[in-house]
A protein has these predicted regions:
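Conserved beta-strand core positions
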Residues: 64, 102-104, 145, 177
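Acidic/histidine-rich, surface-exposed loop or edge segments in extracytoplasmic proteins
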Residues: 65-76
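Short secondary-structure boundary/capping segments
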Residues: 55-57, 64, 96, 137, ...
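N-terminal targeting leaders that direct proteins to extracytoplasmic destinations
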Residues: 1-63
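Compositionally biased, non-globular sequence tracts
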Residues: 23-29, 35-36, 83, 91-94, ...
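Periplasmic peptidoglycan-binding/anchoring modules of Gram-negative envelope and division proteins
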Residues: 45-59, 74-107, 179-183
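Glycine- and acidic-rich phosphate- and metal-coordinating loops
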Residues: 67-69, 104-109
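Periplasmic OmpA-like peptidoglycan-binding domain that tethers envelope proteins to the cell wall
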Residues: 109-183
């Protein structure tokens, strides 16, 4: 159904034009073209599942790695999947369906704020949340998943600037869930 939504929007727009034309009041702005009127319609269409984030996919000879930014998936310091994450997770699930031949690893990572124990637990919960979402929402029950949390032990960017001050951009990059698909 996902590929048909643009046509559904065109159909809805055509119906809306007919209704708008039938309900047009005298003095409303419209152009007459031939026998019909052309109304200026302005509207905004949004994906109800949230903004679709582009996936960062790295592919090598041995694996495919998808990086999902935690700020797209979760609120800060939480492990509950946000509604806005659905489109991004659906994209990732499509890649998993296409590429996975064996066990798919889900690796959770955090920034360095908080204790090591807290970050370890949070990273495990986040990896498990993505695994559960794939199984429950995308129906990937027949695939093998392994989830693991790494806490703040595998940063991809510095958590602090060279002068020792906080680096919010670096910390944001470190908060992520990686999907690793072995070839």
């Amino acid at each position: 159904m996902r590929n048909h939504w643009p046509w559904m929007m065109v159909g809805t727009l055509m119906i809306g034009v007919g209704v708008a034309e039938a309900q047009q009041n005298p003095g409303d702005s419209a152009q007459t073209v031939g026998k019909g009127k052309v109304l200026d319609l302005v509207f905004r269409v949004e994906d109800m599942g949230g903004k679709v984030q582009s996936l960062e996919i790295k592919e090598s000879a041995t694996e495919v790695r998808i990086d999902l930014a935690a700020d797209v998936l979760f609120d800060f310091d939480k492990a509950d999947i946000l509604p806005k994450a659905q489109s991004t997770l659906k994209q990732a699930a499509d890649v998993v369906r296409e590429k996975a031949k064996g066990t798919v690893r889900l690796e959770g990572h955090t920034d360095a704020i908080g204790s090591d124990a807290h970050n370890q637990k949070l990273s495990e919960q986040r990896a498990e949340a993505v695994k559960s979402w794939f199984i429950e929402k995308e129906g990937l029950r027949n695939m093998s998943f392994a989830s693991k949390g790494y806490g703040a032990s595998r940063p991809v960017a510095p958590n602090k600037k060279p002068d020792g001050s906080d680096d919010p951009d670096g910390r944001q990059k470190n908060r992520r869930v990686e999907i690793v698909i072995s070839k």
